[in-house]
Amino acid sequence: MVRDLRTILDGWDFEPGKISVRKIIGSDQRQKIQARVDLGVMQFEVEGRPDGNRPEGCESLLIFHERRLMEYQREFDGDDEFELGTEDCRRLRHEAYLYHQRYVSLFVLEEYEAVERDTETTLRVIDLCHRYAASQRDRDALSAYRNYALMMNTRARALQEVKCDEFENGLAIVEAGIVSLQKAVAVEDAYDPPCEIDNSSEVDLLVALRGEIIARMPDSALPKLNTELAAALLAEDYELATAIRDRIAVAASEQSNSER
C-alpha cells in the first residue's frame, strides 16, 4: 500500500493565503471534502461529524450532551444543577473546531445550505458551553467566536437566496444580521475587556455583502434606487437625485400594483 502523501498532492500545490478545497470520492465510495494545507491535506466527511467519528454512539458530542440535558430536565423538572465539566468542554471545543474547518471549506465550494447547517451546529456548541460549563473559563472560551459563526451563517443564508435570484430576501437576511452583530459588538464593548478577535470586522463583511447584493439587483429595484439616491445627495447632484426620486416613485407604484 502506498502511504506517501505526494501521490495525493501531486499537481495540487499549497498557495499561502488561499483556501484551496476540492471534493473527492473516498475508498468507501462516498464523497469527501479535502482542504489543502501546508505539508499536507485535511479531509472531512460531507455529513455528520467531520471526522466521521460517533462519540458516545451519537452523530456528534453536541447531540450526546443535548440528549443528556433533555433527560436531566425530564428527571429534575429543570436544569439548575446541570453542568459540563472541563473535559466535556475541551472535547466540545475540539468538535466545534472540526465543524469550523468544514464550514469554511464548504463556503469556498459555495455549498451554502451545508454552511448554514454547520454554523448552526457551531452556535449550538458555543451556547451550550456558555450556559452550562462549570467553570467561567470554559463558559467564555468559545464566546469570542460566536460573532464569526453568526456572520458566516448570515452570509450563507443570504447567498443561498441570491443563487436563486431572490435578491430582496438575501438583502433582508443581511440587514438582520448586521443589526444582530452591531448589538452584540456594542454589548461586548461595554462590558467585556478587549479580546484578540476584532468582532467589528464581521459587521464590515456583512456591510460589504449588502453592497454586492444591491449591485446585482435589477436597476428598477427599490433598494438599488435608494442607494443611488443617497449617493447622489452625498455628491450634491440634486438634478440626478430628482431623476432618481421619479424612478423610485414609478418603481414603488409598480410594486404596489403587483402586490394587489
Task: Give the positions of each predicted feature.
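TPR repeat positional signature
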Residues: 92, 99, 118, 147, ...
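Alpha-helical solenoid scaffolds that mediate protein-protein interactions
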Residues: 115, 122, 129, 176-180, ...
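Conserved small-residue packing positions in alpha-helical repeats and bundles
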Residues: 102-106, 110, 151, 156-161, ...
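Acidic, Ser/Thr-rich low-complexity linear motifs
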Residues: 81-86, 131-147, 186-199
